[in-house]
UniProtKB/Swiss-Prot annotation:
This is SsrA-binding protein. Signal peptide: none annotated. Gene3D superfamilies: 2.40.280.10. Keywords: Cytoplasm, RNA-binding. The gene is smpB. Residues 139-160 are annotated as: Disordered.
Length: 160
């Protein structure tokens, strides 16, 4: 059976950009069991509460990544909320660990996808936003939308 080509997104973490200011991003492989891969290929995963940590041995683990049980799995189905190991180079792990050590910083997954047949997760170091940061972002987005609307109306009125 030939390996699938390209990128197919399984899940996105839209809350991450709302709750965190996103810094550098990395692509990491996932260590998965067979039924987890089958469940992901069916498009079932939730990244909402997921986060990653670097342990004392220098390994990166993903927590709270919800991959539901495979519907046609038998008694050998996987644990839904188990911690999953992320595959990164030693240099990448060291840089990720240095960046995530600061106060208020955490490693958050942005999206989960298949790339050339392998399950990958895009992770980033995020700094938690406070409520006033979120309100300010909403104000900026609304102002930008109003400016675009005014520009579109001006262009529309010129054509008449």
């Amino acid at each position: 059976m030939p390996r699938e080509q390209g990128v197919r997104v399984v899940a996105r973490n839209r809350r991450a950009t709302h709750d965190y200011t996103i810094g550098d991003t990395w692509e990491a492989g996932l260590v998965l069991q067979g039924t987890e891969v089958k469940s992901l290929r069916a498009g079932k995963a939730t990244l909402t509460d997921a986060f990653a940590q670097v342990d004392e041995r220098g390994e990166v683990w993903m927590y709270n990544l919800h991959i539901p049980e495979y519907a046609f799995g038998t008694w050998r189905n996987h644990d839904v909320m188990r911690k999953r190991k992320l595959l990164l180079n030693k240099r990448e792990i060291a840089k990720l660990s240095r960046e995530a050590d600061g106060p208020g910083k955490t490693i958050v997954p942005l999206q989960l996808y298949f790339k050339d047949g392998y399950a990958k997760v895009e992770i980033a170091v995020g700094t938690g936003k406070r409520d006033w940061d979120k309100r300010q972002a909403i104000r900026e987005r609304d102002a930008k939308r109003e400016a675009q609307r005014a520009l579109a109306n001006r262009v529309r009125n010129r054509k008449r």
